[in-house]
Amino acid sequence: MASRKDTLVRRASRVRRQIKAVANGRPRLSVHRSSKNIYAQIIDDVAGKTIASASTLDTDLRSSLKTGADTEAATAVGKLLAERASKAGIKDVVFDRGAFIYHGRIKALAEAAREGGLNF
């Protein structure tokens, strides 16, 4: 019987494999959530570099948020990431949810990033 960690790793690699098939050179918006915070970054897989990143640990957001583990915090991170991506000249990305289902905080971050101007 596979452990929970093995299942999550397998799911994340399956999602990443599908993303690389449809990316067409677009950077990847990778999302990670923990029980206390949420992190997002835009990665150029060709160059292996992070273009823009945002999390609830950023000093800009930390003081204005009640907690880093709710949909309000995820929305703020999505907006901040979209703003930083537009400064870097990024409009089109491919969304990498990792092993997390598209629900709750992950969905809130994605919708806020779309409202901020990212296309995926």
From Swiss-Prot:
Pfam families: Ribosomal_L18p
Molecular function via GO: 5S rRNA binding; structural constituent of ribosome
Gene Ontology CC, one term: cytosolic large ribosomal subunit
Domain of life: Bacteria
InterPro entries per record: Ribosomal_uL18_bac-type, Ribosomal_uL18_bac/euk
A single BP term in Gene Ontology: translation
Keyword set, alphabetical order: Ribonucleoprotein, Ribosomal protein, RNA-binding, rRNA-binding
Gene3D superfamilies reported for this sequence: 3.30.420.100
Family that this chain belongs to: Belongs to the universal ribosomal protein uL18 family.
Record note on quaternary structure: Part of the 50S ribosomal subunit; part of the 5S rRNA/L5/L18/L25 subcomplex. Contacts the 5S and 23S rRNAs.
Function: This is one of the proteins that bind and probably mediate the attachment of the 5S RNA into the large ribosomal subunit, where it forms part of the central protuberance.
Protein name (database record): Large ribosomal subunit protein uL18
Gene this chain is encoded by: rplR
